[in-house]
Amino acid sequence: MLETSQTIPELVSWAKEREFSLNLPTERLAFLLAIAIYNAERFDGEMVESDLVDIFRHVSNEFEQSKETIATRANNAINELVKQRFLNRFSSEFTESLSIYRLTPLGVGVSDYYIRQREFSALRLSVQLAIVANEIQRASELAEEGTAKQEDEYYWRRNVFAPLKYSVAEIFDSIDLSQRIMDENQQSIKEEIAELLTKDWQAAIASCERLLDETSGNLRELQDTLNAAGDKLQEQLLRIQDCVIGRDDLYFIDQLITDLQAKLDRIISWGQQAIDLWIGYDRHVHKFIRTAIDMDKNRVFSQRLRQSIHNYFDMPWYLWTAQAERLIDLRDEELALRDEDALGELPEELEYEQLSDLHDQIVDYMQNLLIAQRERNQPIDLSLVLKEQLEGYPLARHFDVARIIVDQAVRLGMASADLSGTYPQWQEINNRGAEVQAHVIDEYK
């Protein structure tokens, strides 16, 4: 993000010589933020000492500090901010008792981080990407024009290098900073969820679900916006890079294009990585909740439930239930949710038969059915077979049953239409919209 021609030893020596230091306790930081908010409402951006004292009085009241020493403490706080270069003080022989104060770039940067940069949205990102797209497109058109007319270095620095360096690169840095703040927001949400899980379960589960859904939605909306613009931006950068190939005098543009491509790749890859990490955390939270309920072993939780039902008319409550479809979505490939460790101890009437037992039953039945069709040399229409067989199984078993049936069918023969290169039509196999695409098996092994 930071581009400088100075080396690390030079910067270290520079900071050491000037004795730079930052010390902002909570009270001083609150004072600086209050100054920034007040300054934003003024047209001239200038403040006098009485303004700063009034602002400090509000901060002091919030921290419940003594009112008798406000003038002295306000003067000390102002001097500290001036000394640390958060404020500039201007005075002359004509205005000795009426100094003027302005926020320094450091003061603006720190306050802007805590105030404005906390607000991040897909709309703001879309506007930034639109500005970047216009700047890069205009620069690419001027680059192609400069190549055609054999323009000099001054033309390239003014019309191509300058927009990319001072507009596009700065917006990329702003997006990168916003993404880093999103990382902090995710961490704070994790801490909030951890705190909720130690409190009342009814409120905790609902609040955790809301926080998880909101964050997941924001990340996906963010990534969709980045993906939509990323390819176009890379294409425009490549257009400019093609124009400077073979031009040794334009090495600075080629280097800048390489840096911008790296920044853009980092911005886009961050979005997908953040989504993947959040999905893993989402699963971890749900697993934690399931484990906590499972450790209850149908005793404490059930006792609380019976007690709540007994006292319902004295203290009415809402019952939160989960949709069956969503539970199916949470199932992983290893069928972990069906294991005893995930479900806990269930009554016998609620236990399901093991998938291996079901697999053997379906294999035996389908072998007898399909082999009979092969002996009669009858074609096997998988869509019809699947539709007939799935009617006898619950929806949660449809995927497993269909996979077993297809596996047994393809072992018996093949479809001659597969060699023609044509695609079969999609056929529905249940009343929930599931479809299969397969040719009729008419050649047996």
From Swiss-Prot:
Q: Which Pfam families match?
A: KicB, MukF_C, MukF_M
Q: Where in the cell is it found?
A: Cytoplasm, Nucleoid
Q: Which Gene3D superfamilies match?
A: Chromosome partition protein MukF, middle domain (1.20.58.590), MukF, C-terminal domain (1.10.225.40), Winged helix-like DNA-binding domain superfamily/Winged helix DNA-binding domain (1.10.10.10)
* An MF annotation (GO) of this entry: calcium ion binding
Any one biological process term the GO annotation gives: cell division
Which stretches of sequence are listed as region Leucine-zipper?
212-240
Fetch the InterPro entries from UniProt: Chromosome_partition_MukF, MukF_C, MukF_C_sf, MukF_M, MukF_M_sp, MukF_WHTH, WH-like_DNA-bd_sf, WH_DNA-bd_sf
Q: Which keywords does this chain's UniProt record carry?
A: Calcium, Cell cycle, Cell division, Chromosome partition, Cytoplasm, DNA condensation
One cellular component (GO) term of this entry: nucleoid
Functional description taken from the UniProt entry: Involved in chromosome condensation, segregation and cell cycle progression. May participate in facilitating chromosome segregation by condensation DNA from both sides of a centrally located replisome during cell division. Not required for mini-F plasmid partitioning. Probably acts via its interaction with MukB and MukE. Overexpression results in anucleate cells. It has a calcium binding activity.
Q: Which family does it belong to?
A: Belongs to the MukF family.
Subunit relationships: Interacts, and probably forms a ternary complex, with MukE and MukB via its C-terminal region. The complex formation is stimulated by calcium or magnesium. It is required for an interaction between MukE and MukB.
NCBIfam families for the chain: PRK05260.1 (NF003615)
Can you say what this protein is called? Chromosome partition protein MukF
- What lineage is this protein's organism placed in? Bacteria, Pseudomonadati, Pseudomonadota, Gammaproteobacteria, Pasteurellales
> Gene name?
mukF
